[in-house]
Amino acid sequence: MLQHFSKVLTAAAFLGLFLSVAGSSPREQVLDDYKNGLGPGWETKSFAGHTQYTVENDGKRFYIKATSNTAASGLFHKIEYEAKEQPILRWSWKIERTKTGDDYAARIYVVFPSLLFWKTSALNYIWANKLPKGEALPNAFIGNAMMIAVESGNGLAGQWLHEEHNIYEDFKKYFKTEPPKVGAIAIMTDTDNTGESVTAWYGPIMIGKDAS
């Protein structure tokens, strides 16, 4: 029960971070290329311990390495733009292994703020442990966040995978309405529920107009 209550607070607090966002975005952009470390647009929010987020380079790419040990903290970037104008979200990621319970080795949030907190919504692109690839379900602790299984299980663990999703179409599909403006994009690797350790890697995130 305490773990479930903690998860509710985590989800609600995370969505609540993005109620005040300003600015605009260019037609197409890389959110951050990490070549000079984490850019100034990133902020961290801890809910249970601290997931360590560091920038590394393997000679082929710059990426964020996320290491979680019984922790749940997110790294988020406030950015405002219309999902209909820039619907494509691209990223690459890699995991060490998937986790059990309500923890996910890797996830990317797209947050759609509302002045009414309970109407703030989010698309969560996850590397799932049990949910089959391509399936989605509401977050178990907060109903206005959809969990979308982009990858699932350990079959491709240890490999860099390149992903692409149309957030405009996804929002309409899962929430049955037109999306408000995007307010933030975030990454999160957590193990506060399982009490284990996990490592994940995130490449640069691209926001664009056209699918590849």
Regions found by a protein language model. Give the residues of each.
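Extracellular carbohydrate-recognition regions
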Residues: 25-47
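Extracellular beta-strand elements of beta-rich domains used
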Residues: 34, 185, 204-207
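Beta-strand acidic-aromatic groove motif in beta-rich domains, primarily in extracellular
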Residues: 99-112, 120-122
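Extended, low-complexity, turn-rich repeat/linker tracts enriched in Gly/Pro/Ser/Thr and Asp/Glu
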Residues: 95-102, 114-116, 193-195
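Short carbohydrate-recognition loop motifs
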Residues: 54-74
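Solvent-exposed strand-to-loop "edge" motifs in beta-rich extracellular domains
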Residues: 92-99, 168-170
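Extracellular/lumenal carbohydrate-interaction signature centered on repeated Trp-anchored short motifs
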Residues: 78-89, 154-157, 178
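Extracellular beta-strand ligand-recognition surfaces/modules
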Residues: 103-108, 143-153, 157-199
